[in-house]
């Protein structure tokens, strides 16, 4: 009897187990189908979740701080681009402010905004280690450096030679030619593959050529530095050059971690990467302050340009 009951019950158990297995397989298939449907429907959100996870795993504090610096710089330059000329520049000298002043300030602020935004995107991409896009954004960051350098020189040239149109045209064409040569070295990958020292020498040499030729011409034309000080703030430009040289030294020597033999991967506000970009972004806005001072000097002097005025 015992054996018969066991034999009779065994098919029932087999049927129940097969039913459970079939239900389990159906459940897993339905779950997989539901997951695939959800991923197909919300594909961008799925990518965003992966991006957030990748950012948490690979982000560094230094790159986050640098990206934050340029994000704040882009926001500030955008606000200045929208409001500064209309609410401060024109009311300061309403009868003598020209359309050229308006264009000069907005042209420089636009380049500062592009510079900060491109560097923000580059360091954000670098922070999450998207290697397939990193090289392209590195090129864009170098191009934005050249754009900012050339625009800063052209804008200060206007206030240096506002009554010498020939010199302004010649040096503006020269700055554009130097910028095109720099573009060639950047776009042909000759600069990206070079070392940190060679990159620094490249940018310093471009800066020296762009600054020295107009200043020497102005000193000869205006009979010394005293007359030159009536047009631009020479002391402020000197401090700007000192800041750029200090940033270059920090970039090459990796100061201060190299001096104190600290771990190069150690992160903090006093890391060389953070200090370098803080100085570079700070000099961009400091040059904007120099332009304001030069604008005040020009419109406060007797030699005011007779161009299109906003108020007659």
UniProtKB/Swiss-Prot annotation:
Q: Does the keyword Nuclease apply?
A: no
Keyword annotations: Endoplasmic reticulum, Membrane, Transmembrane, Transmembrane helix
One matching Pfam family, short form?
Answer: HlyIII
Q: Where is the composition biased (Basic and acidic residues)?
A: 16-38
Taken from the UniProt record, the cysteine pairs bridged by disulfide bonds within this chain are none
In its UniProt record, a GO molecular function of this protein is:
signaling receptor activity
Region Disordered: start-end pairs: 1-38
One Gene Ontology cellular component annotation?
nucleus
Cellular location(s):
Endoplasmic reticulum membrane
Q: How does the UniProt record describe the way this protein sits in the membrane? A: Multi-pass membrane protein
Name a single GO biological process: intracellular zinc ion homeostasis
The organism's superkingdom is given as Eukaryota
| The UniProt record lists the keyword Membrane | yes
Q: What does this protein do?
A: ADIPOR-like receptor involved in zinc metabolism either by altering membrane sterol content or by directly altering cellular zinc levels.
Report what the protein is called: ADIPOR-like receptor IZH4
- Which species is this UniProt entry from? Saccharomyces cerevisiae (strain ATCC 204508 / S288c) (Baker's yeast)
- Identify the taxonomic lineage of the organism of origin: Eukaryota, Fungi, Dikarya, Ascomycota, Saccharomycotina
Q: Which gene encodes it?
A: IZH4
